[in-house]
Amino acid sequence: MAFQGTSRTLTQQSSAATSDDLQKILFSPEAIKKMATECDLGRHHWMRADNAISVRPLVPEVTHGRIASFFKSGYDVGELCSKGYMSVPQVLCAVTRTVSTDAEGSLRIYLADLGDKELSPIDGQCVSLHNHDLPALVSFQPTYDCPMETVGNRKRCFAVVIERHGYIGYTGTTASVCSNWQARFSSKNNNYTHIAAGKTLVLPFNRLAEQTKPSAVARLLKSQLNNIESSQYLLTNAKINQNARSESEDLNVESPPAAIGSSSASRSEAFRPQVVNGL
């Protein structure tokens, strides 16, 4: 006779009480704090000489133990079909440099399984980034779901591994890595299509682009002139002081456009700051 059962979600397989218990485990204030402090979820991790190799699990050790206990208790009484799996569809890392482009060094980033003593890259998904390549976005996609088990004294789960190479003479932070992911937990698992690790080089942000318009540059020059005139231009002649004040007023007050050919129009043209080489 063919199997006629239906696939049930984790919430359907467990009672409402145990489902609430799982929510408390995952989203309690303590769990959220542990995800930030132990896993650096959504936080910037600094790569320094004294931290040349960084291994960051995607689940805090305490949270891992509580989730594993939740699934095991449901499995032992026949409410759940397994002792639990961790699923991570994708891990996305934003990498930026914190030294000049001529610094000789690189980063090696990959996803590993803490159940592997060697911490080898999962399915060869590994990305190397030279310092002059940065900034960049890196992505990893595990091809399987990780069992929530303990191997030796290690809580098995996925982890982001970052290795710093080179950067001779740079003992401080040479790169910043911000990782984001969304871990899922279920009593069922699957295998997934193998996808190579993604590496997208990003153009550095041009923060001066908004000041390329003449109007923005003119405002910048006016503000600079206004800042230095009172401290540097100390004139003794009263008549010249009066003229200097009128120049300042021309720079600070935007008057309505005067008619072409009028004396006021020629006067404003005389005191207009000049733009040199697009600045």
From Swiss-Prot:
One Pfam family from the record: 3A
Coiled-coil portions: none
Which InterPro entries does the record cross-reference, listed alphabetically?
MPV
UniProt record, GO biological process: transport of virus in host, cell to cell
Which UniProt keywords are given for this protein, alphabetically ordered? Host cell junction, Transport, Viral movement protein
In this chain, the stretch annotated as Disordered covers 246-279
CC per GO annotation? host cell plasmodesma
Chief localisation class = host cell
Purpose:
Transports viral genome to neighboring plant cells directly through plasmosdesmata, without any budding. The movement protein allows efficient cell to cell propagation, by bypassing the host cell wall barrier. Acts by forming a tubular structure at the host plasmodesmata, enlarging it enough to allow free passage of virion capsids.
Q: What is this protein called?
A: Movement protein
Where does this protein come from, organism-wise? Cucumber mosaic virus (strain FNY)
